[in-house]
Amino acid sequence: MPLTVSCPICKTPVEWGPQSKFKPFCSERCKMIDLGDWASEKHAIPVKSEFDLDALDELGYDEDSFFKE
């Protein structure tokens, strides 16, 4: 029995196999909707900042002069 997953966009059952051209999506339409959601930043991968943003304030740089050459 083939594995069946739900389309992440419309929840239509999708058979997971070589015949499923757009897996895990049911169609190109759902695939493009998902791509648009990523492009418009409706989805994001959570990451932990490498540095403490509050610590940057303690450096004492003036924003008006920081980016000037």
Swiss-Prot record:
Record keyword Ion transport present: no
**What keywords tag this UniProt record?**
Metal-binding, Zinc
> In this entry, which stretches build a coiled coil?
none
Q: Does the keyword Acyltransferase apply?
A: no
Query: The organism sits in which domain of life?
Result: Bacteria
The Gene Ontology biological process annotation of the record reads:
regulation of DNA-templated transcription
Q: Which cofactor does it need?
A: Zn(2+)
Q: Tell me the cofactor note.
A: Binds 1 zinc ion.
GO MF annotation, one: DNA topoisomerase type II (double strand cut, ATP-hydrolyzing) inhibitor activity
Binding of Zn(2+): at which residues? 7, 10, 26, 30
Q: Which family does it belong to?
A: Belongs to the DNA gyrase inhibitor YacG family.
What does the UniProt record say this protein does?
Inhibits all the catalytic activities of DNA gyrase by preventing its interaction with DNA. Acts by binding directly to the C-terminal domain of GyrB, which probably disrupts DNA binding by the gyrase.
Subunit structure as annotated in this protein's UniProt entry:
Interacts with GyrB.
Cross-referenced NCBIfam families: PRK00418.1 (NF001638)
Q: What is this protein called?
A: DNA gyrase inhibitor YacG
User: What is the name of the gene encoding this protein?
Assistant: yacG
